[in-house]
Amino acid sequence: MDSKHSMISLKQKLSGLLDVIPKQSEIIYADYPLYGNVGDLFIMKGTEAFFKEHGIRVRKRWNPDNFPIGRKLDPNLIIVCQGGGNFGDLYPYYQGFREKIVQTYPNHKIVILPQSIYFQNKDNLKRTAEIFSKHANLHIMTREKASYATAQAYFTTNHIQLLPDMAHQLFPVIPTQQPSNQKLRFIRTDHEANQALQEHAEAESYDWRTVLSASDRRTIAFLQTLNVLNKKAGNPLPIAYIWEKYSDYIVQKAIRFFSRYESVETSRLHGHILSSLLQKENTVIDNSYGKNANYFHTWMEGVPSTRLIQHASKKENLPAHM
């Protein structure tokens, strides 16, 4: 199967979501990302594209900073939580928000979109499982086999599915220009970085923070502050609409940036996914706890022009299936 048909196939797999969010459903989008992690914005744009394609009506869009916890909701609304890689104890703010939603709305169907699950502390995993076990209509979408196995083992009373990342809904993504540079090294610099694997690629590398300008970062910080103040005033301002438009600009900026390069080497999962959506040759470097490798082995292994660096002894960038 060539790269194009591989991407089409992954997009088609997302139709499995319709089993739990049927066409024409009315939903609450509970925790859209209002921050500068551009990978999460690609997830959000894919999610919104999925809703639009299937006639799913979003009644309200909130985020963890302005969700009116405790507000009475129409019992027919499905509460939908953002997918990504922040399910676990590495990101307690977002994990805590999801748990609060599950506890506050025991009679609503709740769907967590495709997530990677990772807990450093098993006690934290057990505590989350205890909270989730009390909800009879909670559906957890996992985005790779390791997370699926964890969910099956610990969230035994919940409904579990395995689906690709929501960003695949965006295919095809059209490059904005012909490449003028050879290889982009797009390397993460935060606590998920795997230094042993990516040190060879860190020279002259970029990350989402360098794609965003100082002006972009100031605008995001301003909107985050405005979002909090807006909640205190009863949410009169259309923050979700303002952010939709501004995040469109950020996502297009990222597409333009990646379009300038022939190939990509990255330790960002969405650097890998965006490169694949653009049908660029790309190498993904595993992160600190195996998220990237797990995703690659679940969905991307065998996709032409994609490679994995998972072990320090295999930095020769050979295809993972060779």
From Swiss-Prot:
Keyword annotations from UniProtKB, A to Z: Exopolysaccharide synthesis, Transferase
Protein name: Putative pyruvyl transferase EpsO
A single MF term (Gene Ontology): transferase activity
Protein's organism: Bacillus subtilis (strain 168)
InterPro entries noted in UniProt: Polysacch_pyruvyl_Trfase (IPR007345)
EC number(s) from the headed UniProt entry: 2.-.-.-
Annotated family: Belongs to the polysaccharide pyruvyl transferase family.
Induction of synthesis: Repressed by SinR.
